Design a protein with these regions (language model features):
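Secretory/extracellular carbohydrate-interaction modules
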Residues: 49-55, 77-78, 203-268
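Extracellular beta-strand ligand-recognition surfaces/modules
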Residues: 70, 84-85, 118-156, 285-289, ...
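Extracellular carbohydrate recognition and processing domains
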Residues: 90-132, 272-284, 288
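Extracellular carbohydrate-recognition regions
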Residues: 1-7, 12-14, 152-188
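Ligand-recognition surfaces built from glycine- and aromatic
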Residues: 147-168, 312-340
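Short carbohydrate-recognition loop motifs
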Residues: 8-46, 188-211, 258-260, 317
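Extra-cytoplasmic beta-strand recognition segments
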Residues: 1, 23, 42-85, 118-124, ...
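Beta-strand acidic-aromatic groove motif in beta-rich domains, primarily in extracellular
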Residues: 34-38, 77-89, 133-134, 233-243
Length: 340
């Protein structure tokens, strides 16, 4: 999509960096200093839809820490332009320009033009409390010249996943699709009730597992931690390497004072466990490190469980928060980073 000007976007065979096609962006006229934004939606909100008959929920595709690359080629009349990548935050609505990654489509010092595709790459900085709604590129006309027409080609956009961020749940808004359908921004969910209560994410159910998910299904080796507070009931857990409603691992607390590692293959089963005296309404920092087929579980920075899954191991997946039975679990925040 594009904004700021009347712009034509078309898929074309005229140019290509790789393959046979690219995205052609045309603006008929730009005054000096004006700009055009071309962007990709990483996350959708209710205002993007005319109705909610499908009752969707969304998690972002792009996260802080990810690297974005794109191939860009300008027409001869557009090579005096500068392009600057940006992201847009769903929570604040703020546009964050990554000016250090800006690219001149020609070399103004050498007075040369470039008639080939150029690679522009940028890494999104580590942030707290941000949901990336858009990633994009802003094209600026020279400050001393009007320009028209403006034409560039974009190709080979790649998202290289390297999430490194933290979310406090009291910063997240609710997405309100209609009177009956609301959800916490950035989360999808399975069963039960998922809501914000006094700044905490609250997940509750009555029989089958109630779960909320976020992240990208191709995340592989990472460290994931959350501040968790068991409420009512006897099953309270965080989820990792989630591959949909039927497959994931989980770590957390269970009845009879146990710390447990589960594996879900349609239903949950215990992989390993150890004694751990936990209390309702007490906060714990629950952490999992997953690397290859090995998992280590920490509580308050102390390692309690280690496991190597040698049978149909799940090697990638997103993250989540869950409970089971007549339980209610609270989560204050979470943090994730990739392992080296």
């Amino acid at each position: 999509a594009s904004r700021n000007q009347k712009v034509l976007l078309t898929n074309t065979k005229e140019e290509a960096a790789g393959g046979e096609r690219s995205l052609k962006v045309i603006a008929p006229y730009l005054h000096k200093g004006e700009s055009v934004q071309v962007y990709f939606k990483s996350y959708y909100v209710p205002q993007d839809f005319q109705d909610s008959r499908y009752d969707p929920d969304f998690s972002p595709i792009v996260y802080p820490g990810d690297k974005i690359t794109v191939m860009i080629k300008a027409s001869n009349s557009s090579q005096q332009m500068t392009v600057c990548p940006f992201i847009r935050d769903r929570i604040t609505g703020q546009y964050i320009k990554l000016e250090k990654a800006a690219l001149h489509l020609s070399d103004p010092l050498q007075n040369t033009q470039n008639d080939k595709f150029q690679k522009l790459e940028f890494q999104i900085p580590t942030y707290e409390d941000i949901l990336i709604e858009e990633i994009g590129w802003e094209f600026y006309a020279p400050i001393d010249n009007n320009m028209g027409p403006f034409t560039v080609f974009l190709d080979d956009v790649e998202i290289i996943q390297n999430p490194n961020y933290m979310i406090h749940f009291d910063k997240l808004p609710m997405e309100r699709w209609n009177v009956l359908h609301t959800c916490v921004a950035g989360l999808t969910w399975l069963r039960g009730k998922v809501e914000l209560e006094d700044g905490w994410l609250a997940v509750s159910g009555c029989s089958a597992p109630a779960e909320a998910y976020t992240g990208e299904i191709h995340w592989k080796n990472y460290r994931f931690q959350s501040i968790i507070r068991p409420g009512k009931g006897d099953t309270h857990r965080i989820l990792f390497r989630v591959q949909g409603a039927m497959r994931c691992y989980a770590a957390g607390f269970m009845k009879d004072n146990r710390l447990v590692l589960w594996k879900k293959e349609k239903d949950y089963r215990v992989l390993c466990q150890c004694p751990f005296t936990w209390e309702s309404n007490k906060e714990y920092k629950l952490t999992v490190e997953v690397n290859g087929n090995k998992t280590v579980i920490y509580v308050n920075d102390h390692a309690y469980l280690e496991w190597e899954d040698k049978e149909n191991a799940y090697n990638e997946g997103c993250i989540g928060f869950g409970t089971e039975g007549s339980s209610r679990t609270f989560f204050k925040e979470y943090e994730i980073c990739m392992l080296e």
